[in-house]
Amino acid sequence: SNSDIEEIIMEEQLIYIIMFFSIVLSALCSMLEATLLSTPLSYITGLEEQGVKGAARLKKLKQDADRPISAILCLNTIANTVGASIVGSLVYEVYGDALVGVFSTIFTLAILFFAEIIPKTIGTNYWRSLAIPASAIINGMIFITYPLVWVLEKFTKLISSRADQV
C-alpha cells in the first residue's frame, strides 16, 4: 500500500541520515584528536606569549591530554557503535538479511576513509589553523562526556597504580 511505501522511503532516508551524522561526528573526533596531538607545546607557548585568545585553553588541554583524548574517544566510539547498530537494524528491517553485509562493508569503508584517514590527515597537516578552534570544541566534548571520562580516569589510575606494584 501507499503508506507502506512511504514508511520504507522514510526508513531508507533515516539510514542515510544516521550514516551521515555518525560519519560527521566521527570525522570531527578524528580531526580534533590529530590536531591536539600534532600541535607542539612550544608553538602553544608562543601563541600564549603573543596574547592569542584561546592559547591558554589549548595549553591546558595539551598539558593534560588524557582527559581531552578520553572525551574524544568516547564520542568517537559512541558515534561509530551506535551508528552501526542503528543502521544495521534499519537495513535488516527495510531490506532483510541479504543487504546487511553489503551495508556493513560500505559503512565500514566510509568510516575508514571519511571519518578516520581524511580527518586525521587534515588534523596533522593543518594543526596551526585548527588548534585554537579545536580547543573550544574539545572543551565542549569534555563537558558533555564528563561523567564517563571521570569514571575512565579513575579506572585508568587504578590500573596504572597496580602496574607500578607488579
Label the predicted regions.
Residues 2-166:
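Membrane-embedded alpha-helical segments of inner-membrane proteins
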